[in-house]
From Swiss-Prot:
PANTHER family: CYTOCHROME B. This is Cytochrome b. The chain crosses the membrane at residues 33-53, 77-98, 113-133, 178-198, 226-246, 288-308, 320-340, 347-367. The cytochrome bc1 complex contains 11 subunits: 3 respiratory subunits (MT-CYB, CYC1 and UQCRFS1), 2 core proteins (UQCRC1 and UQCRC2) and 6 low-molecular weight proteins (UQCRH/QCR6, UQCRB/QCR7, UQCRQ/QCR8, UQCR10/QCR9, UQCR11/QCR10 and a cleavage product of UQCRFS1). This cytochrome bc1 complex then forms a dimer.
Length: 379
């Protein structure tokens, strides 16, 4: 009799995706982040669901309802901080996952990569809207500043902003719709993640060498299931250390002050995971130019397959490209630091130089390095 795992219509899908899936024998811990992102997503949906049971999306009670969750709801504080810091872990895993894709040339799986970029944008939109919900000072002013960027669009900008706000300023209508979108988008992300997996399983995983591994495959279970469990334990350890010892480490103290449209905080800044993009936005003095640079900083990922000039897929055997990759990583950390600093000398100049370097590395230096490495290898 055939194994039920291989014959049952539902079990068969799970089996082909997580049990009997042929996987390369040499994939490193950098391949753990996909499963960690799945765990983060499930954690965020569950904690978010319990938060939504007690949260009210009205401007007069939103801030109080979050305080009520932390003070009066059984274990509400841990649910709230798991959700807030879970978002930080989500983005750490996301950026590591994207970095892995860039380093090992995984972007040559076009459909998987493109769905991945759409996923990144959707997660960023969801996180932004979630940050508005507690209705603190930084929630309100962050929402005002970021939505206002759309007014830079010629002709329709102002109407578009007022349409998104549902009025002439960020108010009740804005908060209610942001809550609605923040609730629905994680399920859209889940669907997109399944499509992402679907396309990945059409081709199979890449590996650190970038060389096809069809000749040497091993079953996903038990080899990579146990490896993913180890990754999940490390993720949960870091998350719990954050939540239980310094839950507000990555947050902004201004968000413990209720939103006040009449009082602007001295430094408006988003959560830490958006600071690099915020720094790029601020580095251009023109509003429309800044908005375009902001969009380009993420959408540039879609160009990666077109900018690949090397005859090798991975950077494993390409020292010049490796140096440029780590320079890019350092540049992103610099931009993250600058995004959290006030707009004054020398931060403005550092931000502008870091922004120029960011686009130069991706658009110019990396493709040139690929050509040089081909020549060095007499290809």
């Amino acid at each position: 009799m055939i194994n039920i795992r291989k014959s049952h219509p539902l079990m068969k899908i799970v089996n082909n995706a997580f049990i009997d899936l042929p996987a390369p024998s040499n994939i490193s811990s950098w391949w753990n982040f996909g499963s960690l992102l799945g765990i983060c997503l499930i954690l965020q949906i569950l904690t978010g669901l319990f938060l939504a049971m007690h949260y009210t999306s009205d401007t007069s009670t939103a801030f109080s309802s979050v305080t009520h969750i932390c003070r009066d709801v059984n274990y509400g504080w841990i649910i709230r901080y798991m959700h807030a810091n879970g978002a930080s872990m989500f983005f750490i895993c996301l950026y590591m996952h994207v970095g892995r894709g860039l380093y090992y040339g995984s972007y040559t799986f076009l459909e998987t990569w493109n769905i991945g970029v759409i996923l990144l944008l959707t997660v960023m939109a969801t996180a932004f809207m979630g940050y508005v919900l507690p209705w603190g000072q930084m929630s309100f002013w962050g929402a005002t500043v970021i939505t206002n960027l759309l007014s830079a669009i010629p002709y329709i900008g102002t109407e578009l902003v007022e349409w998104i706000w549902g009025g002439f300023s960020v108010d009740k209508a804005t908060l209610t719709r942001f809550f609605a979108f923040h609730f629905i988008l994680p399920f859209v992300i889940t669907a997109l993640a399944l499509v992402h997996l679907l396309f990945l399983h059409e081709t199979g995983s890449n590996n650190p060498t970038g060389i096809p591994s069809d000749a040497d495959k091993i079953p996903f279970h038990p080899y990579y299931t146990i490896k993913d469990v180890l990754g999940a334990l490390v993720l949960m350890l870091v998350l719990l250390l954050l939540v239980l010892f310094s839950p507000d480490l990555l947050g902004d103290p201004d968000n413990y002050t209720p939103a006040n449209p009449l009082n602007t905080p001295p430094h408006i800044k988003p959560e830490w995971y958006f600071l690099f993009a915020y720094a790029i936005l601020r580095s251009i003095p023109n509003k429309l130019g800044g908005v375009l640079a902001l969009i380009a900083s993420i959408l540039i990922l879609q160009l990666m397959p077109l900018l690949h000039t090397s005859k090798q897929r991975s950077m494993m055997f390409r020292p010049i490209s490796q140096c440029l990759f780590w320079l890019l990583a350092a540049d992103l950390l610099t931009l993250t630091w600058i995004g959290g600093q006030p707009v004054e000398h020398p931060y403005v100049v550092i931000g502008q130089l870091a922004s120029i370097l960011y686009f130069s590395i991706i658009l110019v230096l990396m493709p040139v390095a690929g050509v040089i490495e081909n020549k060095m290898l007499k290809w």
